[in-house]
Each structure stands twice: as structure tokens, then as C-alpha cells.
From Swiss-Prot:
Protein name (database record): Type-1 fimbrial protein, A chain
Alphabetical keyword list: Disulfide bond, Fimbrium, Signal
Keyword Lyase: no
Lineage: Bacteria, Pseudomonadati, Pseudomonadota, Gammaproteobacteria, Enterobacterales
Annotated compartments: Fimbrium
Main location: other
Cystine crosslinks: 46-86
Family per similarity comment: Belongs to the fimbrial protein family.
Protein source organism: Salmonella typhimurium (strain LT2 / SGSC1412 / ATCC 700720)
Record-level GO BP terms: cell adhesion involved in single-species biofilm formation
Signal peptide: 1-22
Amino acid sequence: MKHKLMTSTIASLMFVAGAAVAADPTPVSVSGGTIHFEGKLVNAACAVSTKSADQTVTLGQYRTASFTAIGNTTAQVPFSIVLNDCDPKVAANAAVAFSGQADNTNPNLLAVSSADNSTTATGVGIEILDNTSSPLKPDGATFSAKQSLVEGTNTLRFTARYKATAAATTPGQANADATFIMKYE
């Protein structure tokens, strides 16, 4: 009899323990973070594609020995600015101007810098060229050649490259940031 009582007690305890495990857990809510939504409504002939509004152009890695004279350049690296929902009845042409920290030696180039306390390369700047291979001074006022707009999506093509500002360069990071403005006519 003692054995039956003990067996039934153990069975009851196992049932209660199983029921406790099987019960629905109490919901818990915790803060998960913040989501920032950004955008802009524009009264213009086109809207700049979100992919074009914030992009990175990778110029690559080059040996300092490649720069032996002022004006030496690297290969041109293409990039583009895509315009969406264009209405050529509002404006027939689009042009772009870039703005950024100009190089002290050659103000037609972007000055290079580094991030995270890395060493900055010297003796080079970054040159931006439009679709006619004309250099664009990063002053926010030198516009690219006008490009005719068609209805819908338009792609404005540019290139960038390193250009020597000295006969000798030193190694390091060679980064730059530029903003751009659109002009519709």
C-alpha cells in the first residue's frame, strides 16, 4: 500500500510538473530599437533614386610608384545618378554639381582623408568627370554638361579617379565625400 501511495504521488508530481512546462509563457515586451524614416518631396522634373542619393564609389588600391609626376591619373571608375519619374515637359535637361572639401594644392580635386585615425595618403586628390570627360570642380557651382531628359527613368553617368597633385605620393587612406545638387532647365 505504501508503494502504491508513493507511485501515485510521483505520478501526480510528474503530471503537475508537465502541466507547468506545457503552460503558455507570459508575454514579455522589451524595447527593440529605433527605425528612422527619411525622405523628401520635391517640386522638380525628376526624383533622385534612393540608390543614387547615398552611394559609395570604390576607386581601388594603387601603388605610390604609379604616380611619378603631377597630373598622373588612375583608371576612371564609373558611377551614376539615376533619376526617376522624370517629366521632360517640366524641364528638358538635367545637370549635376558636386560639392566637397577641395584639395589645397589643386582646388579642382576633392581632398583625400582617412577614417578611424588611419594614415592619410598625400600627393593625390580625387577628380570627378562628367559624361563628356570634363572635370567638375567640387565647388557646388560647376555643373556637368546638360543631359536631355526622357520621360521616366534617366541615368546620368560620371567617372572618378585619383590624380597626382605632387611628383611623389605617400601611402595611406585616400577617401573623400561629396554631395551633389541637381539643376533642371
